From Swiss-Prot:
Protein name per its UniProtKB record: Proline--tRNA ligase
Family of the protein in this entry: Belongs to the class-II aminoacyl-tRNA synthetase family. ProS type 1 subfamily.
Keyword Ligase assigned: yes
Catalytic reaction annotation: tRNA(Pro) + L-proline + ATP = L-prolyl-tRNA(Pro) + AMP + diphosphate
Domain remark text: Consists of three domains: the N-terminal catalytic domain, the editing domain and the C-terminal anticodon-binding domain.
One Pfam family this sequence matches: tRNA_edit
A Gene Ontology BP annotation from the UniProt entry: prolyl-tRNA aminoacylation
This protein's GO CC annotations: cytosol
Keywords noted in UniProt: Aminoacyl-tRNA synthetase, ATP-binding, Cytoplasm, Ligase, Nucleotide-binding, Protein biosynthesis
Location in or out of the cell: Cytoplasm
Assembly description: Homodimer.
High-level lineage: Bacteria, Pseudomonadati, Pseudomonadota, Gammaproteobacteria, Lysobacterales
Amino acid sequence: MRLSQFHLHTTKETPADAELVSHRLMLRAGMIRKLASGLYTWSPLGLRVLRKVEAIVREEMNRAGAVEVLFPTIQPRELWDATGRWEKFGGQLLKIKDRKEQEFCYTPTAEEAAAEFARQEINSYKQLPLNFYQIQTKFRDEIRPRFGVMRAREFLMKDAYSFHLTDADMAREYDNMRAAYIRIFTRLGLEFRAVQADSGAIGGDASQEFHVIAESGEDSLAFSTGSDYAANVETASAALPAPRPAAGETLQRVDTPTQKTCEDVAQLLGLPLQRTVKSIAVMTTAGFVLVLVRGDHAVNEIKLAKVAGMADYRLANESEIRQHLGSEPGFLGPVQPVQPIRIIADRDVATMADFVVGANAVGVHLTGVNWGRDLPEPETVADVRNVVDGDRASDGGELRLTRGIEVGHVFQLGSKYAEALQATVLDENGKAAVMKMGCYGIGISRIVAAAIEQNHDDAGIVWPAPMAPWKVVVCVINPKQDAQVAAAAGDLLEELIAAGIDAALDDRGLRPGAMFADMELLGIPHRVVVSERGLAAGTFEYRARTAESAENLDKAGLFSRLGH
């Protein structure tokens, strides 16, 4: 590939709304160009990177035994009504009508189409298991598309759907896909973690996310120093707290006239924040609930929603708080409410003694509070908090927090979609059985941005070698003025290609400084310079993208550096 014949358009300036490094560098490198909000054209350069990611994903999916299909991007409302997702998916689902006023959606995911295809094609348990995958454009009508292709409305995704007769077989394929994903991200050269996760709108039981580790990641992850345990903070749990100590203080009322937060109360009383308890008032269809977490902890909304009877909870308003507690936010507590209420205590709160809570009186808190003496034991004890850095892990290690960008997700869906769409097969006894489903997604276009977030420096992108648009670019100095140098550079390019090395020739005739800056911006792993001086000495100037300086190598030394 000669860059004089390739559309390469780099820039020094980037739009002010490009917040993430990946967005800025992809625009500067000319990988993408904005068409409309959340919609991007991939340039020839960007497409080379995208196709390299796609190729590795396809190879590993085929290796894992999945078979490729292609579902329509436009799907009829009836399928989505059957699963209940036409309304449940919300505003992100782009709904359209054809000339006959029939309703369709531009799919953000394809569980419905996959289940319908399986219903049409699979009729016997002997055909199972089967795993269909596609690499297809998806669309989600984000309220605020941002961060370039990281959160675009249109994106390229690999989504796979497996079908099984039994839960055990579904679990085996889940493990098979998990192993395939580990191979994919390892081959791409990314630092990543597989973490336990919530199933979200997709639903199902077992669920794991794959995150590229990056400081700019939107997701907070917890991992243990004692094992390979890792989880999204949404689902991560710390070890069980130590048993509750005996009471050592008497109950006392203390004035806290302006102290409404646990931090302010702890400072006033000269106590550790861990001695205070935060009271969060919520309402459910069953009534008023007071949720208690330690003062230095935060409620985990996803965990709380999974507690029995809490799926539909919302924050209580001031009128509801006064009705049940006779007080106002900042001074709430579980001791002697106006009316009987349900109390949900986080596990750490349930094992506390001599703690501090609001007194349900404005400007007053209680100290020396103890379970069983000053208030009944909590009706419900559950893990309803976010873990924090340094928490004890259940494996004996410590939990550490980092940030990540989700690029893959695997689910065990069970029979949810197959049952809704009546996707059944005849089992060994000739009876109809609803198939079990697994679902496995990878955001291919998102991987490109995530890789840049993880791998860049002040000069530009630093691609992992498998993702780079070219492994090597041969830079020729003054190609139009020096035919001998141009010919030598062309010969070297042909030799590199013949050796199986993905290479390009920069024969655009730019000044050396501008040419080298482009190669650094583009993240080319290896740069080779052909010049008149080098030819006279029988050497080429070689520099790796991450090296501090260049070195002169003969041809044998050059090919050795390139791994050949």
